[in-house]
Curated annotation (Swiss-Prot):
Listed EC numbers: 2.5.1.6
Assigned keywords, A-Z: ATP-binding, Cytoplasm, Magnesium, Metal-binding, Nucleotide-binding, One-carbon metabolism, Potassium, Transferase
Binding site for K(+): E42
Protein task: Catalyzes the formation of S-adenosylmethionine (AdoMet) from methionine and ATP. The overall synthetic reaction is composed of two sequential steps, AdoMet formation and the subsequent tripolyphosphate hydrolysis which occurs prior to release of AdoMet from the enzyme.
UniProt subcellular location: Cytoplasm
Name this protein carries in UniProt: S-adenosylmethionine synthase
Classification via InterPro entries: ADOMET_SYNTHASE_CS (IPR022631), S-AdoMet_synt_C (IPR022630), S-AdoMet_synt_central (IPR022629), S-AdoMet_synt_N (IPR022628), S-AdoMet_synthetase (IPR002133), S-AdoMet_synthetase_sfam (IPR022636)
Annotated metabolic or biological route of this protein: Amino-acid biosynthesis; S-adenosyl-L-methionine biosynthesis; S-adenosyl-L-methionine from L-methionine: step 1/1
GO biological process: one example: one-carbon metabolic process
Family: Belongs to the AdoMet synthase family.
Positions bound to Mg(2+): D16
Assembly, per entry: Homotetramer; dimer of dimers.
Amino acid sequence: MRRLFTSESVTEGHPDKVADQISDAILDAMLEQDPKSRVAVETLVTTGLVIVAGEVTTRAYVEIPDIVRKTILEIGYTRAKYGFDGETCGVLTSIHSQSPDIALGVDKALEVKSGEEVADELEALGAGDQGIMFGYATNETPEYMPLPITLAHRLAMRLAEVRKKGILPFLRPDGKTQVTIEYEDDKPVRVDTVLISTQHDPDISQADLREAIIEHVINPVIPEEYRDDKMKILVNPTGRFVLGGPMADTGLTGRKIIVDTYGGWVPHGGGAFSGKDPTKVDRSAHYMARYVAKNVVAAGLADKFLIQLSYAIGVAKPVSILIDTFGTAKVDEEKLLKVITEIFDFRPGAIIKKLNLLRPIYRKTAAYGHFGRNEEEFTWEKLDMVDELKRAFNM
């Protein structure tokens, strides 16, 4: 059976991603000074203005306006004619302390209050909120990610690269990409459509822009094995994209959760990542779920693997764990679930220790996806549990 599936990505200059990066830059600054910082920071960006609000408990002192401006300038909003730039934008902050009622459950989990012994203060942590989280992996790409979101991210990254390196100096920071893949019997066979919308200077013609984007962005990214003469290419289909960024669209933290994860291929629990320290299971448990899924697929136990975790606020252990291999399991699924629960520890404190999450690593995650990347900071992408999983099945 043939079918089409589409995923999108956005550049670091997209308003929602500007907000995500500001929130995570603030988080990083606090974790750098105080790894025990509790942070939940939301950002709004609009014409000439940034608003930062949230709840923070920390010993750190950070100049939030300085972080905001530095982040905006690094993204590329450096000129007032863009309608938004790091030098002149206003910055309003409204930060207060975390609710002590929440802290009661996070500092000491229900299990600890009930007499369960733990190794240290970190393992005593309860979940920072209730919620459901999904992790996924597939062997259809070397990154163990679905191909549509993988290519969409690569195109978005390439848009930023050619802009920043001056290869296409007429590009501006805002942009979006979208890739439609044709599947046959659950295998990707060709790229059906590539869509790129990119902000640009007013004096570049649509024809010249299209030619440049095809030559310098699409051709270097889309693999030959997935191309044919039927592949459709759309570049700025409205015909003009001069007004962009926060001047054209208000941006908010947490509005690109599908871009951040698997491009819509699997369900999403709804919780965003950026601006949240790792005691928030919205972030840390999603990372752990991806870690488990990637190692399971890399171990050859399934071609596709989905795991769902759920938590209750103030409770360390998950309320539930579900797995789904979509009929691709190479081993007994009941045993697979049992093995996973035995060799992976899903308590928030254990996740934080295993993945080394109390570090200022989050700004980099806030654009181009949290998964399928090989940088050192992305510890949840490591394949260091493959051998242990194989041993459990005598493989």
